[in-house]
Design a protein with these regions (language model features):
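C-terminal domain-boundary segment and adjacent tail
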Residues: 45-46, 199-282
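Generic structural signal for well-ordered alpha-helices
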Residues: 36-40, 63-67, 95-102, 131, ...
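Conserved, mostly hydrophobic/aromatic
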Residues: 8, 43, 52, 79, ...
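Active-site-adjacent pocket scaffolds in enzyme catalytic domains
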Residues: 111-112, 118-216
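The substrate-binding groove and active-site-proximal loops of carbohydrate-active enzymes
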Residues: 23-30, 53-55, 82-94, 118-122, ...
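Metal-dependent polysaccharide deacetylase catalytic core of the NodB/CE4 family, i.e.
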Residues: 46-127, 139, 144-151, 172, ...
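Active-site beta->alpha N-cap acidic-glycine motif
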Residues: 1-72
Length: 282
């Protein structure tokens, strides 16, 4: 069973942990290339192609990174333009942000960009209109709906496997692929990326993804900054210190373990030819 390997291409100072204003970004050291280098080395070593969701901001500042990803045969998706949560934007602001990222990525790659992931999984019940906007912009795939809730994001009763969302009574021509979770009865446990991947032991991650793979393809995700152990260590509240910095040194090893143990490919390759249900989210 093949799984999707995804990377959200943002720098350490873009994260919602810090929530720095855009006007301050130029004050911080660009380090996105360090994590990308490590990720590409792993993918090359195991001959795996992945899907990179790239911020428009990063693409404009580091066009050479986008070109390198394309030259190596990886798939490019949009992560929005300025790492704004959908929940902080109205419909027109969101459309403008996504369109800007799509334009720069298509210019750099020479390819149609038809895959999207929101920042911090911020397509939630009150921002379902964002899926209609993505369809208007000719996106065909999305990975923004998290099938569990956190203070910032999530959809309590969302499907845990790929589906076509029904919004306002209409099935969208947009395939949604949620991040993988391990079912626990009616509940579920995230394990496949971010802090969850850094906190959980390899044995549990292996067990959880094998359980998903009994019936479905899974999806894992990471960020370049999660492999960058030399990034600046800011004085932040304890909960932010934990969510952002905890166990960064384990990320590369766990990703390599997954690449050794499971099969991976790009988003579009994994979902190609599948039959997926249409589901109305409530």
């Amino acid at each position: 069973m093949k799984n999707v390997f995804t990377i959200d291409v943002e720098d350490w100072f873009h994260t919602m942990d810090f929530n720095f204003p855009v006007s301050s970004w130029s004050n911080y050291e660009d380090r996105v290339h360090h994590g990308i280098k490590d990720i590409l080395e792993l993918l090359d070593k195991y001959n795996v192609k992945a899907t990179f969701f790239v911020l428009g901001y990063v693409a404009r500042k580091h066009p050479e990174l986008v070109r390198e990803l394309i030259n190596k045969g990886h798939e490019i998706g949009s992560h929005g333009d300025m790492h704004k949560m959908v929940t902080t934007q109205n419909r027109e602001e969101f459309k403008k942000d996504v369109a800007a990222s799509k334009e720069i990525l298509e210019d750099l790659t020479g390819k149609k960009i038809n895959i999207y992931r929101s920042s911090s999984w911020s397509i939630v019940p009150k921002t379902m209109w964002a899926l209609e906007v993505l369809e208007e912009l000719s996106f065909e795939y999305d990975s923004s709906i998290q099938p569990f809730t956190t203070p910032l994001s999530g959809f309590k009763n969302a499907p845990r496997t790929p589906f076509y969302p029904v919004v306002n009574g209409r099935r969208l021509n947009l395939l949604e692929f949620p991040p993988s979770v391990m079912p626990l009865g009616k509940a579920c446990l995230p394990f496949c990326g971010g802090l969850y991947l850094r906190v959980l032991p390899k044995s549990f991650i292996n067990y959880a993804l094998n359980k998903v793979n009994k019936n479905n393809s899974g999806m894992i995700y990471t960020h370049p900054w999660e492999l960058d152990v030399k990034q600046p260590r800011l004085k932040v509240p304890p909960h932010i210190k934990f969510t952002h910095y905890y166990n960064l040194s384990s990320t590369k090893d766990k990703l390599e373990y997954l690449l050794q143990t499971f099969e991976f490919d790009t988003f579009s390759k994994v979902v190609e030819g599948g039959a997926y249900p249409s589901i109305e989210l409530k």
